[in-house]
Amino acid sequence: MKRPWGKAVVKDPNPKITVHGFNNLTKSLSFNIFDIAYAKTEQHRQEYIEYIDELYNAERLTEILTNVTNIIGANILNVARQDYEPQGASVTMLIAEHETPPVGTDWDEEGPGPLPETVVAHLDKSHVTVHTYPESHPDNGISTFRVDVDVSTCGVISPLRALNYLIHSFDSDIVTVDYRVRGMTRDLDGTKHYIDHDINSIQNFLTEDTQNAYQMIDVNVYQENIFHTKMLLKDFDIDNYLFGAGRDEFAQTELDQIEERMKTEMLEIFYSRNLG
C-alpha cells in the first residue's frame, strides 16, 4: 500500500530558553496507528494476521525505534523486546540525551522531522515503547492492525522530531496523535516555564504532502499543554485494501458493498464511535 511521502521543510527555530540546571520538562508523544484490510476467506484472514505479525515482529520494531532515537538525538541505554503468541509484539527502550549535544544540531528544534528514506532514559523519564495489536472480524472480512507508539523525553530533545518518520513507517490509514508537556523548568532569572517552545497544532509538524493526504481534526487544550490530532487518509482505492485476492475475484456489486463497509469501519475508528 503506497503512502504519501514528501520533503520536510524545517521552520525557523524558536527562541531558546536558557534554563537553570537541567531542563525538567517532560514531553510525551503518543500514536495509535491503524492499517485496515479486507480478507475474503477465513484462510485469507489468518494469512493477513500472520503476514502482519511477521512484518512487524519485535526485531523490525526494534529497528524502527532505534531510528526514532537517532532522529530525536538520544542514546539507547537498554532494550527489552518480546514476540507474543498467537500474535503481537512489543519493544521498550530506555533512552538518554547525548552527554554533550553537538553545537548546531536541530534535535531541540520544533519542526517536521526526517522521513524514513533519510534515514526506558534512565536519565529520568525518557523512553520509547511500541505494541502491536492485529485482529480480524469473524464475519465481514475486515481485518485491522493497530500499533501503539509512545515517545517520552525529559530535557531538550523533542519527540516531535520523530512524527513524520513514524507515520511513514507503517501503512497508516488512521492515525491518532497526542502530545503533552508536563512539569516545569526555570530560566536563569528563576522564572518558571511550563513549555519551552511554540505550538498551536500537531499539524504544524507534518510535511505538506502528509497534510494534503489526510483529513485531520484537532482537539487542543492550550492552557494545559495538551494537543490532540486525528488523521484519516483521504484517497480510497479498494485495490489497496484487498488481501489475498484481486478485484477480478469479486462481482462489482460485491466490491461496492466491501468498499462501503471498509469506509464505515474507517470512519468509526476515526471518530471513535459506532455509526451503524
UniProtKB/Swiss-Prot annotation:
- List its EC numbers: 4.1.1.50
What Gene3D superfamilies does the record tag this protein with? S-adenosylmethionine decarboxylase
Q: What is this protein called?
A: S-adenosylmethionine decarboxylase proenzyme
Subunit and partners: Heterooctamer of four alpha and four beta chains arranged as a tetramer of alpha/beta heterodimers.
User: Which organism is this entry from?
Assistant: Alcanivorax borkumensis (strain ATCC 700651 / DSM 11573 / NCIMB 13689 / SK2)
**Pathway listed:** Amine and polyamine biosynthesis; S-adenosylmethioninamine biosynthesis; S-adenosylmethioninamine from S-adenosyl-L-methionine: step 1/1
Which gene is transcribed and translated to give this protein?
Answer: speD
Under NCBIfam families, the record lists: SAM_DCase_Eco (TIGR03331)
Site (Cleavage (non-hydrolytic)) found at: 125-126
SUPFAM superfamilies cross-referenced by the UniProt entry:
S-adenosylmethionine decarboxylase (SSF56276)
Q: Which metal ions or organic cofactors does this protein require, according to UniProt? A: pyruvate
Which residues are recorded with the post-translational modification Pyruvic acid (Ser)?
A: 126
Its domain of life reads: Bacteria
Which EC class, in a word? lyase
Leader sequence segment: none
Catalysis: reaction(s)? S-adenosyl-L-methionine + H(+) = S-adenosyl 3-(methylsulfanyl)propylamine + CO2
Q: Which Gene Ontology cellular component terms are annotated?
A: cytosol
Record keywords, A-Z:
Autocatalytic cleavage, Decarboxylase, Lyase, Polyamine biosynthesis, Pyruvate, S-adenosyl-L-methionine, Schiff base, Spermidine biosynthesis, Zymogen
One GO term of the biological process aspect: spermidine biosynthetic process
